[in-house]
């Protein structure tokens, strides 16, 4: 059985120095930058900057949009989740990161810094949060910030997440291992997996027309061309 390996195709270059989170929308591609904490909305066809929003977040790693158009950002290095008005760019609310902690490789090192969450997705009023320290996806009720469910993810360093076409399934990227898996959230069952060439690091991830988009924190943004049906 051959390994399933995606073919990355660079489509544009991020306007920020360190893109770390993506969210697809009809208006364009939303990008949060870990280097300058700015949000950019980019044109799908050419990467032109359609909007730029300055945020008060701290080295962020995930972004999504809710049903009312508000922007949610995983502010990784102060272990918070920000809800931001798309219209004004002002912070509406700040929540604690549900998965904040110390990454597994650093937990025995004295003085290791706590960090927060990464990839975000939205569905039916709930926020789904991928956390490298906890190695879970946390489903949060945004009305009272209560955890409804948590899903153990495969791998070591979960980052970008994106809804799959299959109901209840999500694509999950592990940056350190260079793999993307399709898992069922209710029980962590894995239904598909593919590798990414070592020249590419998948940090942020989103999906448009059943094609996965990625950002590498060295500025490339592109697509992962791969058969979305398991062949093993």
Give residue ranges: language-model regions.
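Short loop/turn segments that connect beta-strands within beta-propeller blades
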Residues: 43-47, 85-89, 141-145, 184-188, ...
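Blade/loop signatures of beta-propeller domains
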Residues: 1-5
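A short beta-strand motif characteristic of beta-propeller blades
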Residues: 7-13, 48-53, 90-95, 100-110, ...
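Short loop/turn segments immediately following the C-termini of beta-strands
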Residues: 34, 76, 132-133, 175, ...
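Beta-rich, blade/repeat-based domains predominating
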Residues: 13-26, 56-67, 99-124, 153-168, ...
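Conserved beta-propeller blade signature
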Residues: 28-31, 70-73, 126-129, 169-172, ...
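Blade-level signature of beta-propeller repeat domains, shared across WD40, Kelch, NHL, RCC1
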Residues: 201-232
């Amino acid at each position: 059985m051959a390994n399933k390996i995606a073919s990355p195709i660079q489509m544009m270059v991020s306007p920020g120095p360190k893109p770390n989170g993506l969210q697809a929308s009809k208006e364009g591609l939303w990008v949060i930058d870990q280097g300058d904490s700015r949000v950019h909305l980019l044109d799908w066809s050419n990467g032109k900057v359609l909007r730029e929003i300055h945020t008060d977040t701290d080295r962020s790693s995930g972004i999504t949009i809710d049903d009312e158009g508000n922007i949610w950002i995983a502010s990784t290095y102060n272990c918070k989740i920000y809800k931001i008005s798309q219209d004004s760019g002002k912070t509406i609310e700040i929540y604690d990161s549900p998965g904040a902690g110390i990454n597994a490789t650093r937990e025995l090192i004295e003085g290791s810094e706590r960090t927060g969450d990464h990839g975000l997705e939205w569905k039916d009023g709930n926020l789904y949060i991928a956390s490298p320290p906890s190695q879970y996806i946390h489903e949060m009720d945004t009305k009272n910030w209560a955890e409804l469910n948590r899903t153990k993810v495969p791998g070591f360093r979960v980052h970008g997440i994106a809804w799959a076409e299959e109901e209840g399934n999500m694509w999950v990227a592990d940056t350190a291992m260079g793999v993307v898996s399709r898992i069922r959230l209710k029980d962590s069952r894995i239904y598909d997996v593919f590798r990414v060439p070592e020249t590419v690091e998948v940090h942020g991830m989103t999906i448009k027309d059943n094609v996965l988009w990625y950002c590498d924190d060295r500025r490339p943004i592109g697509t992962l061309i791969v058969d979305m049906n398991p062949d093993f």
